Amino acid sequence: MDVADAQVGQLRVKDEVGIRAQKLFQDFLEEFKEDGEIKYTRPAASLESPDRCTLEVSFEDVEKYDQNLATAIIEEYYHIYPFLCQSVSNYVKDRIGLKTQKDCYVAFTEVPTRHKVRDLTTSKIGTLIRISGQVVRTHPVHPELVSGVFMCLDCQTEIRNVEQQFKFTNPTICRNPVCSNRKRFMLDVEKSLFLDFQKIRIQETQAELPRGCIPRAVEIILRSELVETVQAGDRYDFTGTLIVVPDVSVLAGVGTRAENSSRHKPGEGMDGVTGLKALGMRELNYRMAFLACSVQATTARFGGTDLPMSEVTAEDMKKQMTDAEWHKIYEMSKDRNLYQNLISSLFPSIYGNDEVKRGILLQQFGGVAKTTTEKTSLRGDINVCIVGDPSTAKSQFLKQVSDFSPRAIYTSGKASSAAGLTAAVVRDEESFDFVIEAGALMLADNGICCIDEFDKMDQRDQVAIHEAMEQQTISIARAGVRATLNARTSILAAANPINGRYDRSKSLQQNIQLSAPIMSRFDLFFILVDECNEVVDYAIARKIVDLHSNIEESVERAYTREEVLRYVTFARQFKPVISQEAGHMLVENYGHLRQRDTGTSGRSTWRITVRQLESMIRLSEAMAKLECSNRVLERHVKEAFRLLNKSIIRVEQPDIHLDDDEGLDMDDGIQHDIDMENNGAAANVDENNGMDTSASGAVQKKKFTLSFEDYKNLSTMLVLHMRAEEARCEVEGNDTGIKRSNVVTWYLEQVADQIESEDELISRKNLIEKLIDRLIYHDQVIIPLKTSTLKPRIQVQKDFVEEDDPLLVVHPNYVVE
């Protein structure tokens, strides 16, 4: 049965092109063979199921069978599509032996030419094309009236197969020759044909977007089996045709209505009304949309072909590559210096910072995502944060990663809101329903989200990505929409220190405006400090000049970017398992990190938690993937621990110069006068023993510089002793406090075994006195208790000795680290 004969009671001109295409396509289905048997017999038999109604046909098979038919389908697709569907229905009915006709549809795959969203113009309306894009918005599924059956209210004639033009369309006129009804019709819902309908919006990917242009978007219409097959954030290839649909949002908008009453007031002139808007009518506007017949999820091009996003094995990937590409991957996997060659090929224009490059490289491979027996997901993606001074190539790292990674989103923290990073709930223009629009983290699903100026984000916006960074999901509960969406993305963030420069005397958390929960979710922290180094500065300047003078020759790569991308994509499919030896080493290394965190040098790091152990596991798995290994070995754990250790203690606390605190205790006027009186005697001694004094001063100056760790050890030792003495005095009922001289004497007794000469004893005594002065006047850890009553001038000299040796107590608010 032909489509042209389906209209009963209405004279229509036969469509010769459509009828011929229908017969040729039915012959193709019945005759095309592959491996000696008819290819589409089994797929047609599966359409017997009530859930199936679409037959997928490879367009390459049509081209092999009849080039003229393929050309007609390409050029006249929308015109002959009903005839092609009718041929599928006839073919299915003949093969299966159905008693009743079943409405079937055809979907073409493997259309050779892919077009960009920006290339969709009116010249492509009605042709079969394939476009690619990223889904940014999905609408709910609702029924669509495709073909209506109407009843004339005047003569009761049934009018069948009234095609709906993407809006409710009444018959133009009653098909009864003796009836001239044009308005009064009623829809017969029971006999009309409804299909599932879903509308989605896609936009250009960042790789296809010309510089300085706004991403173009187009609406995709999905029907029948294609609904609910796409997810916001994923990239797909859509095969179908570009169509023109009425702009229903304009029709449903607020406008002027036709007035039934008189349009003029009594006494006014009877002037005519001009213009359709004055009559209460609206202009019918049209817009372009894409009617899809097949959808395929894809990632970036791999080995010259498109690689599906579903789980694939090494054998599947091998089939997608040529022999030369496979041999190159095998050769790279055997490279003894692969680790270094990959980072030199990935960042050829950035000098130095090899540790940062290694961390970002391991982020490309990622760990292994796991699911526990309680259905709890453990993320495998690695999050990296780069903190550093201006002009240390932070943004350059992010830009190169966003250009290299097949699925990467680059955004700025200050210009991004919480909804822009996660997901937004917006109102549909046509149905006025609330729909979810994907944010940056959803668009970077199974990829990397590069966030620059991470520290400039508002606090509430940082809180919004807590869940996405650890659970890798985004939960939304607003405007009546409750949903949990996937955000399986790695985050590469760049942040600046608070005052523009990294302060070595402060801890990492004190240098950046990030909360502790956010910091603990990063696996690696890299601190870049702009130090003045003549050798490094010369090398960086030479590199920059070479890049500006001769860009191509100055870039040295061991492998091309395509080879690195192909190798990373291939290695990511490995799922390495932790060996027993590697597990023991992971536990030992985590114990070392925790012990060091509780030590005195822990101020320079952030808090070590169980998340750092999981970070070490992910980094170890990434190292195993880099070597295409199915097992995590001890050497992988060793490198992961080294990298994590490097990122945690990248910047140490500076040495403490006790000589800088000289004079802090000289603010007392009496003390100053006494020193002035004794200057003459001191000068005479210096004149007689000039050489000895200078030598002794040099020795003392060396001793008065302590490392931060030694300084913390000594200060903690004194504080604990003084608090023990304070507690003892309080129990005995004596005055609280301990004399300064007693503290010095106690310390010298503790280190008596280490003192071998009188000079060393004097040096130790001067050192501990300087240390006590710093704790009093600089750190304000110790409080000196001095007499506050006024005394006669005569008693000043007598009481000076007592004031020079005051009682010392520990500040009550001081907490020992």
Swiss-Prot record:
Q: A GO term (biological process) for this protein?
A: DNA replication initiation
Name the positions where ATP binds: S391, T392, A393, K394, S395, N496
Q: Per the record, what is the consequence of mutating T157M? A: In allele 4; homozygous lethal
Q: List the disulfide bonds.
A: none
Known catalytic reactions? ATP + H2O = ADP + phosphate + H(+)
Question: Has keyword Zinc?
Answer: yes
Coiled-coil intervals in this record?
none
| Residue stretches making up the MCM domain | 338-544
Q: Where is this motif: Arginine finger?
A: 520-523
EC number(s) on record? 3.6.4.12
> Where is it mainly found?
nucleus
Q: Does the keyword Hydrolase apply?
A: yes
Q: Which Pfam families match?
A: MCM (PF00493), MCM6_C (PF18263), MCM_lid (PF17855), MCM_N (PF14551), MCM_OB (PF17207)
Query: Which tissues carry this protein?
Result: In stage 12 embryos, strongly expressed in the CNS and weakly in the gut.
Name of the molecule in the record: DNA replication licensing factor Mcm6
Q: Which key words tag this protein in UniProt?
A: ATP-binding, Cell cycle, Cell division, DNA replication, DNA-binding, Helicase, Hydrolase, Metal-binding, Mitosis, Nucleotide-binding, Nucleus, Zinc, Zinc-finger
Q: Which family does it belong to?
A: Belongs to the MCM family.
Changing G388D has the effect of:
In allele 5; homozygous lethal
**GO MF annotations in UniProt:** ATP binding; ATP hydrolysis activity; DNA helicase activity; single-stranded DNA binding; zinc ion binding
Specify which residues bind ADP according to the UniProt entry for this protein.
R611, E614
Q: Where are the zinc fingers (C4-type)?
A: 152-179
Additional notes on this entry: Early fractionation of eukaryotic MCM proteins yielded a variety of dimeric, trimeric and tetrameric complexes with unclear biological significance. Specifically a MCM467 subcomplex is shown to have in vitro helicase activity which is inhibited by the MCM2 subunit. The MCM2-7 hexamer is the proposed physiological active complex.
